[in-house]
């Protein structure tokens, strides 16, 4: 027998009271987006659970995708069976003979939403249990924590049997906690920060700074690929490319080398905040980890943060590098992040950056530049694209890379 559907149970959504259906609807839409790579799959939700109908799709692939989607507590692959006692007895015996090993205990857990069915739940438990005893004489029943639980559901359309329960990602459905703008550099830390924000239900838009010709099409594709990895946890993500060449050249020309990083980060924060406001996001999210590099001391963070009043969420701020790498490997972003492409934070990185920048000095250097004009031109030049779980056969960045080669 092949699985016909996967039943989904919600996680924290059960505690959301009157708002539960809003959370459930968001989870349903997220699942549809993530599973859009399987055109034969259909998704249906009722108040208590979700149903993913496979319609011939590969169960292992669909299951692997569901494991990543935030908001799912657990799910159970199920067999669709003719709604008759003989068919149910035959199916239960076949499943037990496939999975049973000597010494295992079992129980039947039947429920029916179709009350016109000829047996009630208690009688169905008895009849199906007797069928198992006949086929496997030495099997033992155990009502509490058995090795095998065969769940039988009698619905209006058919009967369904499941015996596996697979743990989901938990958390909250992406988009139920508002929207944030993720500063996505292309390194190891920022995709992990984005993942952790997604887990708490924050919809993210990924904002990436590009400085051609100093940064390459390969660096931009890397950022696209990292964003696509993050779509696995809740569906499509908007990607925002910001032109940053003019600003970096201006900073390099008019400021001391030791302050290049602080000034660069302040411009990035201003632009991110402006884009955030225009696009209706509530917070800024970044991958800063305290003490990891010169721009991530408390003094540097204070100097950089001074340009905005918007809350800045730093999900990895207290983690060390190995902890961040562990998560990056778990979510499959690490190998992409370590690809050797320069990004805006590394191309003009000073040998001895200021770790304790003075705001009055920073403001003095910024007075040499047309800060507002630079920010306005960068924001006016943004390029917005939608990144989906399904990778396009070839996008514009791929074509640029081929042309260069």
UniProtKB/Swiss-Prot annotation:
Gene3D superfamilies: 3.30.2130.30, HUPs
Entry GO CC: cytosol
Domain THUMP: 60-165
GO molecular function, one term: CCA tRNA nucleotidyltransferase activity
Enzymatic reactions: [ThiI sulfur-carrier protein]-S-sulfanyl-L-cysteine + a uridine in tRNA + 2 reduced [2Fe-2S]-[ferredoxin] + ATP + H(+) = [ThiI sulfur-carrier protein]-L-cysteine + a 4-thiouridine in tRNA + 2 oxidized [2Fe-2S]-[ferredoxin] + AMP + diphosphate; [ThiS sulfur-carrier protein]-C-terminal Gly-Gly-AMP + S-sulfanyl-L-cysteinyl-[cysteine desulfurase] + AH2 = [ThiS sulfur-carrier protein]-C-terminal-Gly-aminoethanethioate + L-cysteinyl-[cysteine desulfurase] + A + AMP + 2 H(+)
KW Nucleotide-binding (keyword) present: yes
CDD domains from the UniProt entry: PPase_ThiI, THUMP_ThiI
The protein's role, per its UniProt record: Catalyzes the ATP-dependent transfer of a sulfur to tRNA to produce 4-thiouridine in position 8 of tRNAs, which functions as a near-UV photosensor. Also catalyzes the transfer of sulfur to the sulfur carrier protein ThiS, forming ThiS-thiocarboxylate. This is a step in the synthesis of thiazole, in the thiamine biosynthesis pathway. The sulfur is donated as persulfide by IscS.
Protein name: Probable tRNA sulfurtransferase
Species this protein is from: Streptococcus suis (strain 05ZYH33)
Originating gene: thiI
């Amino acid at each position: 027998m092949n699985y016909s559907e996967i039943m989904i149970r919600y996680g924290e959504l059960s505690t959301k009271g009157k708002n539960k259906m809003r959370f459930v609807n968001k989870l349903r839409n997220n699942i549809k987006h993530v599973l859009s790579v399987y055109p034969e799959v259909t998704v249906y939700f009722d108040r208590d659970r979700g149903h993913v109908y496979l319609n011939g799709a590969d169960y292992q692939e669909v299951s692997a995708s569901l494991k990543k989607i935030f908001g799912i507590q657990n799910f159970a692959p199920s067999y669709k069976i003719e709604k008759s006692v003989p068919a149910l007895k035959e199916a239960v015996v076949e499943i037990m003979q496939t999975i049973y090993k000597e010494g295992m205990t079992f129980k039947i857990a039947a429920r029916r939403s179709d009350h016109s069915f000829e047996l009630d739940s208690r009688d169905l438990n008895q009849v199906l249990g007797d069928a198992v005893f006949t086929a496997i004489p030495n099997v033992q029943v155990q009502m509490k924590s058995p090795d095998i639980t065969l769940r039988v559901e009698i619905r209006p359309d058919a009967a369904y049997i499941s015996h596996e329960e697979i743990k989901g990602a938990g958390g909250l459905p992406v988009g139920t906690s508002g929207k944030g703008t993720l500063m996505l550099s292309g390194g190891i830390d920022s995709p992990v920060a984005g993942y952790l924000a997604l887990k708490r239900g924050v919809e993210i838009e990924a904002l990436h700074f590009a400085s051609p010709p100093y940064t390459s099409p390969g660096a931009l594709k890397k950022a696209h690929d990292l964003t696509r990895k993050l779509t696995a946890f809740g569906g499509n993500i908007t990607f925002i490319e910001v032109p940053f060449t003019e600003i970096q050249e201006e900073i390099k020309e008019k400021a001391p080398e030791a302050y290049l990083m602080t000034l660069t980060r302040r411009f990035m924060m201003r632009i991110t905040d402006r884009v955030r406001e225009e696009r209706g996001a509530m917070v800024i999210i970044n991958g800063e980890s305290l003490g990891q590099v010169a721009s991530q001391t408390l003094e540097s963070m204070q100097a950089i943060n001074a340009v905005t009043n918007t809350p800045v969420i730093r999900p990895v701020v207290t983690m060390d590098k190995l902890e961040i790498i562990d998560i990056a490997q778990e979510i499959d972003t690490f190998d992409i992040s370590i690809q050797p492409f320069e990004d805006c934070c590394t191309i003009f990185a000073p040998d001895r950056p200021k770790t304790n920048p003075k705001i009055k000095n920073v403001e003095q250097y910024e007075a040499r530049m047309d800060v507002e004009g630079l920010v306005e031109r960068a924001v006016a030049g943004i390029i917005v694209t939608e990144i989906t779980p399904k990778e396009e056969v070839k996008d514009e960045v791929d074509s640029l890379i081929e042309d260069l080669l």
